Amino acid sequence: MQIYYLANIPSPPQGVWHLGPVPIRAYAMCIIVGILVALWMTLRRYTARGGNPDVVWDAALVVIPAGIIGGRLYHVITDNDKYFCSTCDPLDALKITNGGLGIWGAVALGAVAVWLMFKVKGIPLGPFADAVAPGLILAQAIGRLGNWFNQELYGRETTVPWALDIYYRVNESGEYAPISGRSTGEVIASVHPTFLYELLWNVAVCVFLLWAHKAFKLGHGRVFALYVAGYTAGRFVVENMRADDATLIFGLRVNVIVSVVCFVVALIVYIRLPRGQETPEEVDPARSTDAGDSVGTADSQR
């Protein structure tokens, strides 16, 4: 009796389709789906804590563009040799649909933008950050599928049964086009599917955050701190498996160093933040104001 096993994981034959003259890019679609999922989860979680759903929509208008800009800036800065060399086209730095969004920059600039908005509006950031965290890392997991379609950010060559086959892709002119082209069926490498490793890790962290939030009644931003610690722990391992070129500092990939720093900072922040959860009135200060106005109106009518 013979037993047959799956012979490697195939890459998609292409990552771009055309609807007439309009290109439909899988990478962009994965980002959009991830954003929608994160928005849906944040709405449910924030309103369950007593937050105003309008706050989520207002924050989305700020954090989404800020996150995309921050993510692209981080990528371009840390991989500047891909865009600013003698044979490079600097305008490629603007082509985000071709891949290249650094999560560190996205979270950092997005967080700063939301913090400024909440400070102006007088809304506490902690409850919102805790509501965002599980949906954010699930969105990151969905976004990793975009790397699969783009055949990018994979690991070193391997012979494990779950290796990812990278295809030779060409455009309509027959020229090599690894992102926008279509597969010829020729496998040029079998590699560690690091996109899948990170995807699965992110889903596991999402489940853990949902459980920990409920089991330990976490609040005041502690869920978000756990998100940062959990994500960076996995990213540290996966980053060391990747084979793509990266900026090195002291011989280490820049994202490895950033992962270590963020992990340590997240643990310190988690320990220093208050225990327990905020009351609905603390989550949405407008509640207490409205309640006070209602009492004052009722007293004046007596």
UniProtKB/Swiss-Prot annotation:
Main location: membrane
One Pfam entry name: LGT
Cystine residue pairs: none
Statement: the UniProt record of this protein carries the keyword ATP-binding: no
Source species, domain of life: Bacteria
Location in or out of the cell: Cell membrane
Claim: GTP-binding is one of the keywords in the record: no
Region (Disordered): 279-302
Keywords, sorted A to Z: Cell membrane, Membrane, Transferase, Transmembrane, Transmembrane helix
Pathway: Protein modification; lipoprotein biosynthesis (diacylglyceryl transfer)
EC number: 2.5.1.145
Source organism (scientific name): Corynebacterium aurimucosum (strain ATCC 700975 / DSM 44827 / CIP 107346 / CN-1) (Corynebacterium nigricans)
Name listed for the protein in its UniProt record: Phosphatidylglycerol--prolipoprotein diacylglyceryl transferase
GO molecular function: phosphatidylglycerol-prolipoprotein diacylglyceryl transferase activity
Topology within the bilayer: Multi-pass membrane protein
Function as written in the Swiss-Prot or TrEMBL entry: Catalyzes the transfer of the diacylglyceryl group from phosphatidylglycerol to the sulfhydryl group of the N-terminal cysteine of a prolipoprotein, the first step in the formation of mature lipoproteins.
Spans through the membrane: 19-39, 50-70, 98-118, 191-211, 249-269
InterPro entries assigned: Lgt (IPR001640)
Entry similarity comment: Belongs to the Lgt family.
